[in-house]
């Protein structure tokens, strides 16, 4: 396991600096490859803004969160799904990979959701204010916009949306789906 700095990642994502982030991923992957890894996963949803470019240069196969989530959305049969995450993830409707489903981002509070997410991810804790922003946005997406489920398209949203605690609407935790795919890949070498 290797860690790409969150602040640098979010800055590269915000600025669309694909080349810089891919270089970080490549160097980390090469270091891990010397330790014997056979596959790599970028576990940050935000970090997938450059995943196609990274796959082209990665010395090992990439377990792609976007592919995993696309399959899970299809498996669950969603036609309209809401989205919470960073500004880029929401504005691009999950990087444009969900072509079989209508993806709805928060309409009036997209920037507020983004700012709450970045604040929470940077601090590593969720405050009551963060929770209120995400719960309000998720509720609006389901009740006002008719979304069948809310995609938790930010790795750190697990700080707010915890197992066994019903937020009042269905969720699809992208990080959880990705973690299951990573575990499956590890067990089926």
Task: Kindly give the residue locations of the regions a language model identified.
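Non-catalytic structural scaffold of enzyme domains
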Residues: 1-189
């Amino acid at each position: 396991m290797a860690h790409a700095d969150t602040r640098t990642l979010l800055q590269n994502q915000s600025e669309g600096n694909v080349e810089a982030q891919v270089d970080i991923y490549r160097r980390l992957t090469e270091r891990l490859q010397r330790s014997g890894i056979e596959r790599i996963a970028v576990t940050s949803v935000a970090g997938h803004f450059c995943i196609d470019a990274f796959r082209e240069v990665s010395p090992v196969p990439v377990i792609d969160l976007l592919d995993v989530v696309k399959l899970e959305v299809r498996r669950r049969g969603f036609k309209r799904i809401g989205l919470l995450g960073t500004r880029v993830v929401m504005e691009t409707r999950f990087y444009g990979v969900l072509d079989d489903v209508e993806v709805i981002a928060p309409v009036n509070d997209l920037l507020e959701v983004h700012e709450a997410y970045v604040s929470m991810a940077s601090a590593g804790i969720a405050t009551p204010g963060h929770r209120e922003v995400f719960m309000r946005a998720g509720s609006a997406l389901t009740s006002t916009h008719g979304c069948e489920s809310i995609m938790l398209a930010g790795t750190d949203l697990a700080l707010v949306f915890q197992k066994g605690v019903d937020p009042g609407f269905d969720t699809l935790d992208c990080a959880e789906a990705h973690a299951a795919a990573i575990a499956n890949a590890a067990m089926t070498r």
